[in-house]
């Protein structure tokens, strides 16, 4: 029997230390019943159902799981992904948007599957409440950096829960 691998690290930007069992999948939860994030959760749920390969969709059964997302910490890629998703939002919704809304993208800008790196048919964008979009972004950052310790290039999935 092989012992599980434990990786310990210190994140350079925040100087926080922690450990992670590498065999334990990193799964970020978003909730449809959380009024602060329900718009993002709904968008992600629909995107995972319609995008090729159910990208990022978590299921305990590997046969029903989508392809993993991989994190990028490269600011140039993150910014390029955000710019590309913004362009795609304006293209798909030329009538514009109301004040207080943000362009939400899935897969996330902080992944190697973001809008600047994949065809438009592998992306989903939608205008949602800015507060909702920012809340999920903040939670995702905490998940990647502190809770799950997902390093640059490592895999993670997203589970939409009730």
Residue spans for each PLM region:
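Nuclease and nuclease-like effector domains acting on nucleic acids or nucleotide cofactors
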Residues: 1-100, 109-162
């Amino acid at each position: 029997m092989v012992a599980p691998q434990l990786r310990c690290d210190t994140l350079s930007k925040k100087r926080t230390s922690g450990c992670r069992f590498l065999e334990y999948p990193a799964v970020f939860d978003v909730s449809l019943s959380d009024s602060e994030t329900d718009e993002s959760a709904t968008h992600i749920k629909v995107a995972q159902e319609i995008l090729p390969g159910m990208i990022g969709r978590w299921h305990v059964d590997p046969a029903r799981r989508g392809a993993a997302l991989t994190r990028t910490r490269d600011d140039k890629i993150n910014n390029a992904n955000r710019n590309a998703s913004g362009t795609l939002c304006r293209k798909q919704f030329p009538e514009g948007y109301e004040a207080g809304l943000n362009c939400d993208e899935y897969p996330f800008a902080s992944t190697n599957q973001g809008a600047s790196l994949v065809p438009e048919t592998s992306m989903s964008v939608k205008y949602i409440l800015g507060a909702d979009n920012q809340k999920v972004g903040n939670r995702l950052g905490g998940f990647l950096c502190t809770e799950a310790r997902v390093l640059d290039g490592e895999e993670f999935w997203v589970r939409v829960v009730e």
